[in-house]
Amino acid sequence: VPGACSTITEEEVKNIEAVLKEAEYVLLQLEVNQEANELVAELACKHGCKVIVNTAPYAPVTDEFLSKAYMVTPNEVEAEEITGVPVKDLESAKKAAAYFYDRGVKEVLITLGSRGVFVSSGGREEIIPCFKVEAVDTTGAGDAFNGGLLAALSEGRDIWEAVRFASGLAALSVQKMGTT
């Protein structure tokens, strides 16, 4: 149902608190209303659950909300909208990452489409190339990436291996029409 994510209530969020107590990660995206996202982030942090924010679809975010994020995963357009830095290469990606770090984020991934993924983690910053495929339909590639990322991290893979795995899933998702 279009727009259903914008109707999530405080009561519905509080109903998942027990899940957040047991979870290692929670993935938030900006299609959900801001109040619900902020409450999930607050509860997750309270219970030691790492908050990963997929900044899609773009919507303004507060510094307070970002301060609760362990990791952010914007694409290059979303990163520019949030930080004001046009992300075109490694150096500009580092500048955008600094914006997130200044707000308390611990790890920054910026997806760059066919150019790969900028990863900033533990003082190491680089662009990991993506798999070269013929893209037919990119709808849902970000969702595939983020789902793969969380699956790999939940299995205990390090961020570098998790990004490669997530990139592989995103590459698979774009090769046919309607793979979302």
Put a short name on every predicted segment.
Residues 1-73, 77-127:
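Ribokinase/PfkB-type carbohydrate-kinase core domain
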Residues 60-65, 90-180:
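Conserved phosphate-binding/catalytic region of the ribokinase-like
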